[in-house]
Amino acid sequence: MVGILALEAQRTGTVVIGEDLGTVEESVRGELARFGILGTNVVWFEKAGDTENARASADYRRLALVAVGTHDMPPTLSYLRGGHITLREELGVLTRPAEVEDAEDRAWQQAVFNQLATEGVLDPAVTPRPDDELAVVEALHRFAAATPAALTVTNLVDMVGDTRAQNQPGTTRDLYPNWCVPLCDSQQRPVLLEDIAGQPLFARLAAAARRGGG
């Protein structure tokens, strides 16, 4: 089946991206790569081997699409503020005490910030608090752009400053409006398609995510 997929992709000039996140055997990733199918790497999920350190940008896969976050995560601004923990607690789907989740999450975020600083895309003095959050978001996208991955992607919600999750795993529509959340700016004002490029954050993130220098 993978061979047929690869053949059809070659015939039509199509790039195929596999979502190989989570519990996927390395042998599967190797087989997909053998057929030229790109994998997926998410900055927030990437550890350096079995350590608690973040993976260096140079150690990312070539045959992959790299993103800062995913559709199952809140926008980056919200993630920095612990919005993913707060929302799950409010919805009653948090399986551990919020304090435990928050402590672990902050430790991991700090590991990522340390790597960003090591690679020179984030000032070590910057902290992920309201005054510096946008600098952190920009640094994350510069980091993604610095990887050797074949493709990178920037989430639209990040480019307009939205803070609401588009999808909350483990819930149904009666608990959370999955995939029905309108695109808004940081002030929760609706953003229309024709207005996206004029958003203040759009140009900043586009420059940060551009390869070869912002």
What kind of region is each of these model predictions?
Residues 1-214:
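Catalytic cores of glycan-processing enzymes that make or break glycosidic bonds
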